[in-house]
């Protein structure tokens, strides 16, 4: 092992010209208090919060920029939506032109067909009336003329017959008269004598005129000529049809000519211009600013709180550093007083200025270093152990576990992770109310933005639609005027023509009637009849033509000004996605840019939570490693040792040469064969077979120096099979008979009771509990709590062959220069007194009393003495330091006394050796002790004094260090139990296995001595915070 570099040496006369010291003083430590791990972790968390705040500000600016960019995109989208009239007009113009052209063509065809139908209807009506009238007129006129002609002819015939008969009658009457006259004359003549008288003759007129008497031939000729001159129906029908059809044909020709020139071309229809909207200047971004301001406010509040907390921690750390410095100074004083008052510390000088000559082992220095490095853990564990009455193994394991998990780097990971997670979780919890607060604001902003976009789109659409409607209506007016003036222009002339035609027709009929009945009695009735029959119809036709003249005009519907304007529902449907894309998104308008802002900050916090969680996970790994190490050292190694022991026992079941040695009566045995066979002392044992777990070369058990315990309380506890075995209970060597020396087992020693005079009384009750067990479970809650930390102590088993000490065969030392009275205990190695400031046991040596077994069983406990320099006062070994008053009353200067029990040499041989009990053997095996031969004791003329009464035993968790002795003629008497460094619980004293010289219970008070004057402080010098 390489030696460390030694510090430089200087001349004693060399003086240092600096006021600094090789170590840090209080002012220097106070200047470094701001570098404590909690403060550094808080500073780290504050920097993370500051970075998160900066990231949040950048996110807010990015979100606002994204909103403006989205708004520009929304403007383009809204422009496209507002330009829908243009695209609608492009398609509407084509459809409108096709509709207008189709309408004009249909109107032309309808008009032509209507005129044709009207013409046919009029002709039919006129023909109906004409046919009826002419048929009736022909009947009346022709019949009347025929009657008149027949009447004239009859009258002429009557007149001719009357006039002919009248002429004949006249002529016959005249002829008769002439005849009568003639006769008469003849008769007269006859009588007359006168002669004949000549009868006068009346001349008979010819009366031919009467024979030709007729009506005037002109009247008959007039009637005959009238009857011959009445026109026929076919001629009148053709004339009327030609009169009626002429305007209609002209109208049809005019309509066709007019509609041929009318055509609605879509290329000449107006198209609205594309209107660009601009509404981003009206976007309200106050919601983003407010939510960002609230988030930043939370981060700033967190930073301020962390800074204030760090400042408070700096102040507390300054106080803590001052307190630690004060406790350290007191601790140094405690250490000096502990060394000066410890009876095992043999000093050569009485002055307090001279340092005591003490051997500081590595283990003790490590204990001091651990206590000074983690004073808070030490203080807490001492108080917990005192309150909960932990066993030594529990105390050691838990203290080691706390040292392990709160190692400086692990503690830094824990603090960074804890404070970081705390800050992240607080921010995440604070984000919920903030987000809920701005949900309504975001929804209102989206609604307002939608209204702004809708209003802009509506204004643009109204303007474009009005311009488009005006242009379309002007073109419709031109077409309408063209149709009304061109197509229906005939109404102005045709109505007059029709009226003139009908009036002419009516006039002709009247003329015809007048002509026919001119001067006759039928003229007036015929005129009345014609007026009644035809006049009303003619008047009706004139009224119809007048109505057509007044109402026959085309009125084409005009285009409404809002023809290209969408309904409010359609505008909202078109603008809502645009507004949602600009400000809010998702089904509820909560996942837009505002939602993305919240999600981005939340994602940043979650990433930080993962980072801080990794720090805590690293600390958790350390905790898990510590738990695994505890489990291995507590259970794993014990199980492995048991497994190896069982394997070895199976190999040694057959004994030596097949000879099985029976058990001794009264001696406990753990298995059938026993851990150690009852053989003579120097009987050679068979060599064990080579095992994969143990080598044949030297180990701790077979090394010349014996079993040396490890340098720490942890490694010493590992050597024990159970937790409750640390510190080990005392092994007392009691001489029962002069011929035998039987070691009392560990459990038997645990049952000892101390009488009033300091003697021991062993109990035989196996069920009696030790005082420590009774104290541990004195209360219910403490018993329940400690049950979790303790386990049932198994029956100790024998160790392996490699670790078994040769306690049954003591290594003898024969001194040929001195008598047997001086061959006492090894004062330098095996029976040094126990130091009360050491924290763990040193190498355990078997008492020389076990080597030199007395033959009488009823003898008292063997004691050993050694000397101290003259002038040094020693205290009673059984009195603990906390029992000292303000003066060293219990310390007394004693001179040497002759040994009360000289032991002969032959007691060490096998013939008189008493075999120790199996329980004691197992206990010794567990400690891995050896019994090296006692070294030569220094020559003394005085004998060992009688041991003082053990008035009050002092227990210690530490073993004795080897002090440095100077030549002196004085010795200090110590009991054997004190030399064996046991920790058995005595009924006469309260046991605290965790007491050290630096605890409050062991504070030392010195009276009236300026060298040792100090105040007794009721605090633990190492019980301070980290």
From Swiss-Prot:
Residues 1-26, 130-300, 425-611 are extracellular. One of its GO terms (biological process) is plasma membrane fusion involved in cytogamy. InterPro entries: PRM1. Residues 749-758 have a biased composition (Basic and acidic residues). It is a multi-pass membrane protein. Residues 48-108, 322-403, 633-1026 are cytoplasmic. It is found in: Cell membrane. PANTHER family: PLASMA MEMBRANE FUSION PROTEIN PRM1. Belongs to the PRM1 family. This is Plasma membrane fusion protein PRM1. The gene is PRM1.
């Amino acid at each position: 092992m390489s030696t460390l570099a030694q510090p430089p040496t200087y001349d004693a006369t060399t003086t240092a010209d600096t006021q600094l010291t090789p170590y840090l003083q209080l002012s220097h430590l106070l200047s470094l208090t701001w570098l404590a791990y909690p403060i550094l972790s808080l500073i780290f968390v504050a920097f993370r919060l500051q970075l998160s705040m900066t990231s949040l500000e950048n996110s807010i600016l990015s979100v606002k920029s994204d909103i403006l960019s989205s708004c520009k995109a929304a403007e383009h989208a809204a422009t496209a939506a507002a330009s829908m009239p243009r695209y609608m007009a492009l398609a509407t113009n084509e459809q409108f032109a096709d509709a207008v052209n189709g309408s004009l063509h249909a109107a032309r065809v309808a008009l032509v067909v209507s005129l044709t139908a009207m013409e046919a209807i009029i002709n039919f009506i006129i023909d109906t009336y004409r046919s009826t009238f002419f048929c009736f007129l022909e009947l009346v006129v022709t019949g009347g003329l025929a009657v008149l002609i027949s009447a004239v002819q009859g009258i002429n015939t009557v007149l001719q017959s009357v006039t002919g008969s009248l002429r004949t009658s006249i002529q016959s009457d005249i002829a008769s008269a002439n005849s009568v006259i003639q006769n008469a004359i003849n008769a007269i003549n006859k009588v007359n004598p006168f002669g004949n008288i000549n009868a006068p003759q009346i001349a008979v007129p010819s009366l031919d005129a009467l024979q030709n008497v007729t009506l005037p031939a002109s009247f008959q000729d007039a009637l005959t000529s009238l009857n011959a001159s009445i026109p026929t129906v076919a001629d009148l029908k053709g004339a009327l049809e030609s009169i009626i059809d002429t305007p209609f044909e002209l109208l049809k020709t005019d309509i066709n000519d007019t509609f041929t020139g009318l055509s609605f071309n879509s290329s000449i229809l107006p198209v609205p211009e594309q209107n660009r909207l601009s509404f981003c200047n009206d976007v309200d971004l106050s919601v983003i600013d407010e939510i960002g301001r609230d988030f930043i406010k939370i981060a700033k509040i967190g930073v301020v709180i962390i800074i204030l907390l760090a400042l408070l921690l700096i102040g507390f750390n300054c106080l803590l550093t001052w307190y630690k410095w004060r406790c350290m100074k007191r601790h140094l004083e405690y250490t000096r007083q502990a060394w000066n008052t410890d009876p095992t510390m043999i000093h050569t000088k009485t002055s307090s200025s001279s340092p005591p000559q003490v051997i500081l082992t590595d283990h003790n220095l490590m204990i001091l270093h651990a206590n000074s490095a983690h004073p808070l853990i030490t203080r807490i564990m001492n108080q917990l152990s005192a309150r909960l009455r932990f066993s030594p193994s529990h105390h050691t394991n838990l203290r080691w576990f706390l040292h392990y998990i709160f190692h400086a780097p692990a503690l830094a990971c824990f603090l960074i992770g804890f404070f970081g997670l705390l800050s992240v979780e607080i921010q995440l919890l604070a984000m919920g109310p903030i987000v809920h607060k701005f949900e309504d604001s975001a929804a209102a902003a989206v609604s307002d933005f939608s209204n702004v976009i809708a209003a802009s789109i509506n204004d643009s659409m109204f303007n474009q639609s009005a311009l488009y409607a005006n242009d379309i209506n002007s073109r419709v007016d031109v077409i309408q005027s063209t149709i009304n003036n061109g197509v229906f222009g005939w109404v102005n002339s045709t109505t007059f023509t029709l009226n003139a035609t009908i009036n002419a027709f009516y006039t002709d009929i009247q003329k015809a009637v007048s002509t026919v009945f001119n001067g006759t009695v039928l003229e007036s009735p015929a005129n009345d009849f014609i007026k009644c029959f035809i006049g009303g119809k003619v008047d009706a036709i004139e009224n119809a033509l007048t109505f057509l003249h007044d109402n026959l005009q085309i009125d084409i519907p005009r285009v409404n000004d809002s023809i290209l304007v969408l309904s409010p529902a359609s505008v909202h449907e078109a603008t809502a996605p645009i507004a949602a894309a600009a400000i809010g998104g998702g089904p509820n308008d909560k996942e837009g840019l505002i939602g993305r802002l919240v999600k981005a900050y939340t994602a940043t916090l979650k990433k930080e939570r993962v980072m801080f969680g990794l720090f805590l996970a690293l600390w958790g790994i350390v905790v898990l490693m510590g738990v695994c190490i505890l489990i291995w050292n507590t259970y794993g190694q014990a199980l492995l040792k048991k497994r190896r022991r069982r394997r070895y026992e199976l190999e040694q079941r057959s004994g030596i040469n097949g000879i099985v040695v029976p058990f001794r009566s009264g001696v406990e045995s753990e298995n059938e064969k026993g851990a150690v066979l009852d053989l003579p002392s120097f009987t050679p044992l068979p060599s064990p077979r080579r095992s994969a777990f143990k080598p044949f070369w030297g180990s701790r058990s077979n090394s010349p120096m014996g079993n040396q315990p490890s340098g720490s309380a942890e490694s010493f506890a590992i050597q024990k099979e159970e937790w409750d075995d640390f510190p080990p209970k005392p092994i007392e060597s009691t001489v029962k008979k002069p011929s035998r020396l039987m070691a009392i087992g560990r459990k038997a020693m645990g049952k000892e009771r101390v009488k009033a005079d300091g003697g021991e009384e062993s109990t035989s009750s196996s069920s009696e509990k030790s005082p420590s067990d009774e104290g541990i479970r004195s209360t219910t809650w403490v018993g329940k709590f400690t049950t979790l930390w303790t386990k049932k102590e198994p029956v100790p088993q024998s160790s392996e062959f490699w670790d078994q000490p040769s306690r049954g065969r003591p290594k003898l030392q024969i001194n040929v220069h001195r008598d047997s009275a001086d061959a006492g205990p090894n004062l330098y190695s095996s029976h040094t007194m126990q130091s009360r400031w050491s924290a763990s046991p040193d190498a355990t040596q078997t008492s020389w009393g076990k080597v030199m077994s007395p033959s009488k069983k009823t003898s008292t406990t063997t004691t050993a003495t050694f000397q101290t320099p003259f002038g040094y006062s020693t205290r009673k070994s059984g009195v603990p330091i906390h029992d000292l008053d303000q003066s060293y009353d219990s310390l007394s200067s004693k001179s040497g006394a002759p040994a009360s029990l000289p032991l002969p040499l032959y007691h060490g041989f096998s013939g008189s050796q008493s075999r120790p009990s199996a329980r004691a053997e197992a206990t010794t095996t567990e400690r891995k002790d050896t019994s090296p031969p006692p070294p030569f004791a220094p020559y003394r003329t005085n004998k060992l004094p009688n041991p003082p009464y053990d008035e009050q035993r002092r227990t210690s968790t530490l073993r004795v260090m080897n002090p440095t002795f100077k030549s002196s003629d004085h010795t200090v008497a110590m009991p054997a139990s004190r030399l064996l460094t046991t920790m058995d619980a005595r009924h006469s004293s309260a046991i605290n296995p965790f007491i050290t010289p630096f605890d409050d219970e062991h504070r030392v008070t010195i009276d009236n001595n300026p060298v040792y004057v100090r105040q007794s402080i009721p605090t633990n010098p190492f019980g301070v915070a980290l």
